[in-house]
From Swiss-Prot:
Compartment annotation: Mitochondrion
EC number(s) on file: 6.3.5.-
InterPro entries linked: Asp/Glu-ADT_sf_sub_c, GatC
Domain of life (superkingdom): Eukaryota
Transit peptide: 1-17
Alphabetized UniProt keyword annotations: ATP-binding, Ligase, Mitochondrion, Nucleotide-binding, Protein biosynthesis, Transit peptide
Record-given protein name: Glutamyl-tRNA(Gln) amidotransferase subunit C, mitochondrial
Biological role stated in the UniProt entry: Allows the formation of correctly charged Gln-tRNA(Gln) through the transamidation of misacylated Glu-tRNA(Gln) in the mitochondria. The reaction takes place in the presence of glutamine and ATP through an activated gamma-phospho-Glu-tRNA(Gln).
SUPFAM superfamilies per the UniProt record, alphabetical: Glu-tRNAGln amidotransferase C subunit (SSF141000)
Alphabetized HAMAP family for the sequence: GatC (MF_00122)
Length: 144
């Protein structure tokens, strides 16, 4: 009888707490004036710099508007008041994880190079990721 009542109370408590989300879906800003509401317009030089650094093509207006929305979202996060909020921790922070021993398997270079799409002088050839993109006309910003 006692065990049944304890399990009922436990399930009732868990059910009542699980219906409310612990982490809010959107950032909570205590000072709405500092939220930075409004639209953010990026200059063409900024878009060119971000395109060159990230190697992402912002060639149309939709891509630039997505970038502006991301910057706006990040500016809202920067204005969130975190005073008095303790940093999050993980239960695995101080735990030594026991991993299995690595067993090295010997295989020939011919077997390994069978996985490569392009081979040059017995080396894998990967597509270059650091070639700068050519600048576009105005990136859909409307201003020149």
């Amino acid at each position: 009888m006692f065990r049944r009542s304890v399990s009922f109370v436990r399930s009732h408590v868990l059910r009542s707490f699980s219906s409310q989300p612990v982490v809010p879906v959107t950032p909570i800003v205590k000072n709405p004036a500092s939220q930075g509401a409004g639209t953010i317009k990026l200059e063409q030089s900024t878009v060119e710099l971000l395109e060159r650094l990230s190697l992402v093509d912002f060639s149309n207006a939709e891509a630039v508007s997505r970038l502006e929305e991301a910057v706006k979202f990040a500016s809202v996060i920067m204005n969130v008041d975190t005073t008095g909020v303790r940093p999050m921790v993980t239960p695995l922070e101080d735990t030594v994880l026991r991993l299995r021993d690595d067993v090295a398997e010997k295989c020939s270079s011919e077997d390994v190079l069978k996985n490569a799409a392009v081979i040059e002088e017995d080396y894998f050839v990967a597509p270059p990721g650091n070639i700068p993109l050519e600048p576009k006309a105005n990136y859909g910003l409307g201003n020149s």
